Amino acid sequence: MESIDRSFTIRADVGFCSSHEDFMCLHFAAADFPEEALSTPRWKHDVFLSFRGEDTRKGFISHLHHELDYWQAIKTFKDNRDLERGTSISPELLCAIEESQLAIIVLSPNYASSTWCLDELTKVVECMEARDTILPIFYGVDPSQVRNQTGSFAEAFTEHKEKLITKKKVEQWKADLTKVANLCGWDSKNF
């Protein structure tokens, strides 16, 4: 059993299953709620979800969020806004990352085309890398595409360079994607 600082336990039987409706859902089994954990939580959110809305919001993310939130035991932050292109990441979102115990990064074909997602990723790596609390999910992309920035990830970075985003920022995003892609995670082709 793996313990979370909020003093409840997530059992090791975490995994994906296919239901009779043929969708994927993540099952977490939560238990053991000491009273002090409920009164003085260390983290505002147990999980921060980072995802590209156009790829996953109405399908995979909605099911994942539902499963995480089902027992009201795992407090999950999910940004519900559809963002306009070029919008900067909000201070509230940066704060939500800082106040989260764990981040689930859902890397999908268009993830890297969003500067917002990449800025989120940089903040997640900054806050959580040392604690080993980042879980990547490779949704419709091979981990090697993310790690090496090939395919749609290469195309996205070509577009970012054409938009005159600083070389330093682009290199930071690439380094962060590589770090996250090298972590143990889940690949949707194995669900």
Which residues make up each language-model segment?
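Cross-kingdom TIR/SEFIR domain
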Residues: H66-Y70, I89-N190
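Conserved N-terminal substructure of TIR/SEFIR domains
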Residues: M1-L102, C127
